Amino acid sequence: MTRHGKNCTAGAVYTYHEKKKDTAASGYGTQNIRLSRDAVKDFDCCCLSLQPCHDPVVTPDGYLYEREAILEYILHQKKEIARQMKAYEKQRGTRREEQKELQRAASQDHVRGFLEKESAIVSRPLNPFTAKALSGTSPDDVQPGPSVGPPSKDKDKVLPSFWIPSLTPEAKATKLEKPSRTVTCPMSGKPLRMSDLTPVHFTPLDSSVDRVGLITRSERYVCAVTRDSLSNATPCAVLRPSGAVVTLECVEKLIRKDMVDPVTGDKLTDRDIIVLQRGGTGFAGSGVKLQAEKSRPVMQA
């Protein structure tokens, strides 16, 4: 309620609209927004460049990428992993040298203490007729017992004086974790290899129109079997052997009966039918999540 008094016609009630506006301006709390059609990509656009694909490939999870964009992403991730691994190995070697130096210093302190004790030993003649020798103990050998009185001031907790140069806390380097060598998909987060990418061949609506002319149209491609137009409102699937794009209705009614690729004639398995991830139409009934969240720090009392 930091800006309640600064709003126009401020009243005694903190309204929902004021709360949402203050949350957006404060920088705290999780923000939710409902995505509109303008924020949803088309089904034939790359998930990285958000532009219509010229040489599309699809992952086993159904995410469509431009071949050049995804290969550049994989190459960049491999370089980043190599850089992180080099920094990790360097820090690991530095820590190993520090541990060896500490062990060497501890060993030297142990030897130095032993030599000091050896040089401080004084041999005294023992009189066998004294009571000390008969008892086998000396007053110097008696160890003090545990104290039952109040604790002394010397044993009180000593807080470090950080303003003294000798007691200034030392800033230590952040410990690096061993990076994973696996390249992950930028959308699903699952492991991704170049061999997992399947080429996709869209069937254009009009084969006489070039690629530039197709981009300006709202309906650009059709199903390779039924010739139905493809859009974000039409669930699609990619057949792995041929790379053809067909509708899910065609898959359920025609292809699953014989499990044969209608383009190449190859046998199909469930793994060969890749459901294409589409952006949706902007309506809630499209079956696509249209709610975006941004997590920010939470201010608690």
Curated annotation (Swiss-Prot):
It is an enzyme of class 2 (transferase). The keyword Transferase applies. GO terms for cellular component: cytoplasm; cytosol; Golgi membrane; nucleoplasm; nucleus. It is found in: Cytoplasm; Nucleus. Keywords: Cytoplasm, Developmental protein, Nucleus, Phosphoprotein, Transferase, Ubl conjugation pathway. Residues 132-157 are annotated as: Disordered. It catalyses: S-ubiquitinyl-[E2 ubiquitin-conjugating enzyme]-L-cysteine + [acceptor protein]-L-lysine = [E2 ubiquitin-conjugating enzyme]-L-cysteine + N(6)-ubiquitinyl-[acceptor protein]-L-lysine. Its EC number is 2.3.2.27. One of its GO terms (molecular function) is molecular sequestering activity. Expressed in heart, brain and lung. Present in endothelial cells (at protein level). Residues 55-75 are annotated as: U-box-like. It comes from the Eukaryota. The modification Phosphoserine is found at residues 36, 107. GO terms for biological process: negative regulation of catalytic activity; negative regulation of nitric-oxide synthase activity; nitric oxide metabolic process; regulation of nitric oxide biosynthetic process. A motif (Nuclear localization signal) lies at residues 78-101. Interacts with NOS1 and NOS3. Interacts with PP2A holoenzyme, containing PPP2CA, PPP2CB, PPP2R1A and PPP2R2A subunits. PANTHER family: ENOS INTERACTING PROTEIN, NITRIC OXIDE SYNTHASE-INTERACTING PROTEIN. Belongs to the NOSIP family. The U-box-like region is a truncated U-box domain. It is unknown whether it is functional or not. E3 ubiquitin-protein ligase that is essential for proper development of the forebrain, the eye, and the face. Catalyzes monoubiquitination of serine/threonine-protein phosphatase 2A (PP2A) catalytic subunit PPP2CA/PPP2CB. Negatively regulates nitric oxide production by inducing NOS1 and NOS3 translocation to actin cytoskeleton and inhibiting their enzymatic activity. This is Nitric oxide synthase-interacting protein.
